[in-house]
Design a protein with these regions (language model features):
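Short, charged low-complexity intrinsically disordered segments located at boundaries
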Residues: 88, 204, 225-228, 265-274, ...
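Nucleotide-sugar donor-binding/catalytic module of glycosyltransferases
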Residues: 1-238, 242-248, 252, 375-404
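Basic, ligand-binding patches in group-transfer machinery
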Residues: 275-451
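Short amphipathic alpha-helical coiled-coil/interface segments
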Residues: 49, 260-264, 287-295
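Short, surface-exposed acidic
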Residues: 250-254, 303-305
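P-loop NTPase catalytic cores that bind/hydrolyze ATP
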Residues: 240-241, 252-276
């Protein structure tokens, strides 16, 4: 255990650099955690802030015994070294990493820890929300859509699509036994750490309880925001080089590579207006060729990592020609929502003739309001659901507009692709709301008002 006495249940490690504006809220949320403070410690590691952050930390450390603050001798340039030092100094059985501008729910982590303790879990996942100026949105819903235990962490579907610290608790022993540390990178250091951590954890719990809030308000500047698309892509290439050589379960490795190919390159590099507007597209293409070469050198075919039909079609257009690829990206960004048709109760995308060599894209689930019906002396709102045969409806919710943290589960009946909701049930504390269909465990679709 690294020579330390493990006498706390949970250690909260927070790296800090010039976050004076946000620290009070972050620290207060830790103070407000519904847990005996003798069982937890909060370790704040300051990366030689040039504002008043360290003085704020010292004030809280003087006032609360469970709060510690450490300052590095010189600025390290990123969160990796402060986090590693915090983990090294921690005395908790479990650790969670918190960003200094974020905040926690009072009951979320305490309840998740109890759940992990009861079931002997190595890692736990709770629901996180990204707070932006105009809205609040769920983060990584695939890791926190229900209460469940006894899960194999790296087998949770899409788990590697969310490789940041938000909403995660893990055993300290996993990082020590496998020497898992954060790498000192300007971007993507989380991917390497959590990819290895999740892959080498043996058991997991998840909860749909709210645990973590991510600060993405416009007045919050981070290294991630300051890193442009090309620079991020180059960091992701370095991450791919490291990950593909790691000793990980083969299934986990393939899921991680799939995430890098689909999300970090096809989605976040190519399917963007900035790519179409670029006067130097060869830079983008050269990076993607390097990705393919890295994958090929290790005995894989990039098509083995394409799971989403949208991205698969993009890659096939890329193979056809760069001109077709750029036309396909333009279609997906500007025209895809305008060209649809219904066949066999499934919504299809109507491609231009130039893409007739590509399989037709279809939507898993689309729901449309079909009016108010009066039946058996009761008013019902009727929703028609267009869906693939293998799509399973899981539930119906009211979700506050622009705030996914506020929601209400509805009772419903479903017959022949029609969902029936009692009109009197459609209220959400006087908020304006959307009706949302939950399907295939964690996926969701907002109901359209009309065709």
């Amino acid at each position: 255990m690294g020579g330390l006495t493990i006498n706390k249940l949970i250690s909260i490690v927070v790296s800090v650099y010039n976050k004076e504006k946000f620290l009070d809220k972050c620290i207060q949320s830790i103070i407000d955690l519904n847990r005996d403070k003798s069982q937890l410690e909060a370790i704040f590691v300051d990366d030689v802030s040039t504002d008043n952050s360290y003085n704020i930390l010292k004030k809280y450390a003087d006032e609360y015994d469970f709060i510690r603050c450490i300052q590095l001798e010189e600025n390290s340039g990123g969160p990796a070294d402060p986090r590693n030092l915090g983990i090294q100094e921690s005395k908790g059985k479990y650790i969670t990493i918190v960003d200094a501008d974020d905040w926690l729910e009072p009951n979320g982590y305490p309840n998740l820890i109890n759940q992990m303790e009861e079931h002997g879990s190595d890692i736990g996942f709770g629901q996180a929300f990204k707070n932006r100026n105009k809205d609040i949105v769920k983060v990584a819903n695939f890791a926190s859509y229900k209460k469940a235990n006894g899960l194999v962490p790296y087998e949770i579907y899409k788990i590697f699509r969310g490789m940041g610290p938000w909403g995660k608790i893990f055993k300290r022993s996993t990082t020590i036994d496998h020497n898992i540390k954060f790498r000192n990178l300007k971007f993507a250091e989380d991917k390497l750490f959590y990819a290895e951590l999740i892959s080498k954890s043996k058991s997991a719990s998840m909860t749909d309880e709210h645990v973590y809030h991510v600060n993405r308000y416009s007045d919050n500047i981070s290294l991630v925001k300051e890193t442009d698309d090309i620079e991020k892509a180059n960091f992701n290439i370095e991450v791919l080089k490291d990950l593909i050589k790691m000793d990980l379960p083969e299934y986990a490795k393939k899921q991680i590579i799939s995430r890098i190919v689909e999300m970090d390159f096809i989605s976040r590099v190519f399917i963007k207006k900035s790519f179409l507007k670029s006067n130097n597209k060869d830079v983008y293409y050269n990076m993607f060729e390097e990705v393919q070469n890295i994958i090929k050198e290790h005995g894989y075919d990039i098509e083995d990592f394409l799971e989403n039909e949208r991205y698969t079609n993009a890659f096939h257009a890329y193979q056809h020609s760069k001109e077709h690829f750029e036309e396909y990206i333009k279609f997906m960004l500007y025209n895809a929502h305008a060209h649809k048709y219904i066949k066999n109760n499934v919504v299809h995308f109507n491609y231009p003739d130039k893409f007739n060599y590509l399989p037709t894209l279809t939507s898993k689930c689309v729901a449309v309001h079909d009016g108010t019906h009066y039946m058996n002396e009761t008013f019902y709102e009727v929703l028609h659901v267009y869906k693939k045969p293998n799509t399973t409806i899981e539930g119906v919710e009211l979700v506050k507009i622009n705030d996914e943290s506020t929601r209400k589960t509805l009772k419903y009946e479903i017959h022949d692709n029609q969902i029936y909701l009692k009109t009197d049930d459609l209220h959400l504390d006087n908020y304006d709301f959307n009706i949302v269909i939950k399907f295939n465990d964690f996926e969701h679709s907002t109901v359209y008002a009309s065709h």
